[in-house]
Swiss-Prot record:
Domain of life: Eukaryota
Species, as recorded: Bos taurus (Bovine)
Keywords associated with the record: Calcium, Calmodulin-binding, Isopeptide bond, Leucine-rich repeat, Lipoprotein, Membrane, Phosphoprotein, Prenylation, Repeat, Ubl conjugation, Ubl conjugation pathway
Protein name according to UniProt: F-box/LRR-repeat protein 2
Main location: membrane
Amino acid sequence: MVFSNNDEGLINKKLPKELLLRIFSFLDIVTLCRCAQISKAWNILALDGSNWQRIDLFNFQTDVEGRVVENISKRCGGFLRKLSLRGCIGVGDSSLKTFAQNCRNIEHLNLNGCTKITDSTCYSLSRFCSKLKHLDLTSCVSITNSSLKGISEGCRHLEYLNLSWCDQITKDGVEALVRGCRGLRALLLRGCTQLEDEALKHIQNYCHELVSLNLQSCSRVTDDGVVQLCRGCPRLQALCLSGCGSLTDASLTALALNCPRLQILEAARCSHLTDAGFTLLARNCHDLEKMDLEECILITDRTLTQLSIHCPKLQALSLSHCELITDDGILHLSNSPCGHERLRVLELDNCLLITDVALEHLEHCRGLERLELYDCQQVTRAGIKRMRAQLPHVRVHAYFAPVTPPTAAGGGGPRLCRCCVIL
């Protein structure tokens, strides 16, 4: 529908400004910018700061430069509560200093992938943005411990901080952070490879409200650090230890005895964990919903039996490369309350003992949405077809190597690779 100038003028006269602003508040960035071009009146309405409380510039990341952020900050001022600059690699410290000065009520700021920023940006946020609750600095590789010291002094209401792949961070930075930001509920430290057990001890001492911690690829972390962490963070609900390859059942025991609210555990490539540790965990953590046990190569069907008995809320389970898992383990899982009612995702890549019999058992999992079967060499196309006849909504991901062409009788004749045969 196309409005004439008379129509637009009538709308402006009939509806009060407050109602028009309310209507404009439901529009996205692109639509607001289009409305701003209709008339002077609509330009004022569309660009009113109250309509720009939440801005996500990810879809425009290649076009966003520092001046764009500065202009937005001047227009929005104290109205802006949430800004995402994820992937905006053209934005640097100077622009974010202007932003921090103008938008002092900002609560949620995403700088994921803004690789130009340095500690200077964090100093600006610390100085001007005391209401900040959520900060994402993923892959801001120039960030150092100095940033964390600044944040701890000026952003004491911080609840969520993502420092993934900021690999200059050490235990000293973590100590400075948690001393000042004791209300942290989520701390993501993926790829912070310099962190050691002492960093976890600092978290244990000060972050008693912590519910989510990601330590993926923090390979220097040992059982001692995890044990200390669990003792000080009893509210922990999500923990990623994937790639912390030295951990043993002592870590699982600490989780089982101290963190009964645990819902998500990612322990991929923790190859020393065994059935004994997961048995104790299952018997104490009944709220488990998601588990990534990829390459926990020592676990057997016993772990699945315990999960099926004690963890009725389990929704997603990765057992890729757990080569001791058999059809019997899948039977226990499928016949359990979680199998019947909750299980949505099951990953069995490279589980070499799994056969079509396991797929028959999985037909009982009526809620199953995705099944990974790559390189399960005893699973057949026919078995998958039978299962999908019972579960037509399930997405099955599997790979079957192309059949090798038979060798010509007598070995004579030209030999063609399969690519050439296809062509």
